[in-house]
A protein has these predicted regions:
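Acidic, low-complexity cytosolic segments
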Residues: 1-20, 27-122
Length: 122
């Protein structure tokens, strides 16, 4: 499964305006990653896990259901985080010039495919 997931991430990075993508456990452990830059996936995994945990807690406190996605936009780029049940998240890093809707749509599509592949094994 990891090789199929890596291919999915590689395809996303070559067909979409993204700098890299990775699948992490919700605990913050790297699972599969594909970054075009020298990005340290262990560092990104820890930050994504922190954001995920905080967001899950917020949704619980506000009684807004389960977490589906997070979009973080900065002046130099954006990161889209999408839940990949069971127990994983997909993080997609894109430059500022990338259209948020396009990146988000591609991330959701890849997350669905990742979920399907992971569920086949487990």
């Amino acid at each position: 499964v990891p090789s199929h997931l890596k291919e999915l991430l590689k395809d996303l990075c070559t067909t979409s305006p993204v700098l890299g993508a990775a699948i992490f456990t919700v605990e913050g452990l790297p699972f599969v990653s594909y970054f075009n830059t020298g990005t340290e996936d262990v560092t990104v995994a820890a930050m994504v896990a922190s954001l995920h945990s905080t967001s899950v807690q917020m949704l619980h406190e506000l009684r807004q259901g389960s977490l589906k996605s997070i979009i973080v936009e900065g002046t130099g780029g954006k990161t889209v985080i999408v839940s990949v049940p069971p127990g994983y998240v997909l993080a997609v890093v894109a430059p500022d010039i990338a259209r948020t809707g396009l990146v988000f749509g591609d991330a959701k599509r890849v997350a669905r495919e990742c979920t399907r592949l992971i569920e086949q094994v487990g």
